[in-house]
Amino acid sequence: MAYDEKLIAALKSKAKTLRRDTIEMIKAGGAGWLGGSFSQADIITALMFHHLKHDPGNPKWEERDRLIVSKAHCCETVYAALGEAGYFDKKEYRSYGKFGAVLQAHTERIVPGIEYSGGSLGQGLSFALGEAMAARIGRPTPLYRVFCILGDGECNEGQVWEAVMAAAHYKVDNLVAIIDHNKFQSGSKVEDRINLIPMVEKWQTFGWNAVEIDGHNYTEILTALENADKTPGQPHAIVAHTVKCKGVPAFEHKNLHFCKLTDDMYAEAMAVLG
């Protein structure tokens, strides 16, 4: 599917802004989840600034689409997107991760625009499934859609697959799971812990409409999201192949999970993103 070049350029520019603001947040907070935040930045951008139905002026609008970030530690790009969209003042970035601040190191629902208070991995898809089923109660068509971003490492958790089975059984077709498949988790490559390959076929076998894409290619991201709306009767999985730390070439493909930014790292990142 072809998209307007101006739209793609605008989304790329927005993603660069989110990555830059993420660097500023992590620098202000002393440390943060750099790699996983950067790998999901293009997905977050496509959702927040093109695909989702939401209203920053009315964060609790009943018909809004829900974005559940199960990998809730990678909250920095989510906060950056919400601030950029106007859910809160960007000055909140400066207090990220500090005691008593609104923006903490995992997503919390006290933050305008955040739908899910995260922490332990593997739980977000179950929460998203409940939200998606609630949207269908007493209605011929769902009131809203639910999008859940998972890390590939957290797919080691059995609870994820319980939710996968339940969603397929109940044909919850207003639920879209997006797997940020950057191939790393805390401490190792994902394949060295529990090998999840073939990822797409697993979701398909469990009864999902599953596809795989380049998670940094906006045409592929937007096409997959739009196609999910056109395929009734099944929940949808998008396995997005991504690069950890995408956006700063010197950091890419490195397992910079939770890290402190040195002055040199900050300068290197801002030379690309600033």
Place the predicted regions along the sequence by residue:
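N-terminal hydrophobic or amphipathic helices/low-complexity stretches enriched
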Residues: M1-L18
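Cofactor-binding active-site loop characterized by glycine-rich and histidine/acidic residues
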Residues: T22-M25, S37-H169
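Generic beta-sheet signal
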Residues: D65-L67, Y144-C148, L175, Q234-T242
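Glycine-rich beta-alpha junction loops
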Residues: H73-C74, V78, N182-K183, N217, ...
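Short acidic, glycine/serine/threonine-rich loops at helix termini
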Residues: Y79-A81, E108, Q159-W161, G187-E191, ...
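Thiamine diphosphate
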Residues: G113, S117-S120, G124-T231
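Glycine/aspartate-rich loop-and-adjacent alpha/beta segment that forms the canonical ThDP
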Residues: Y218-G274
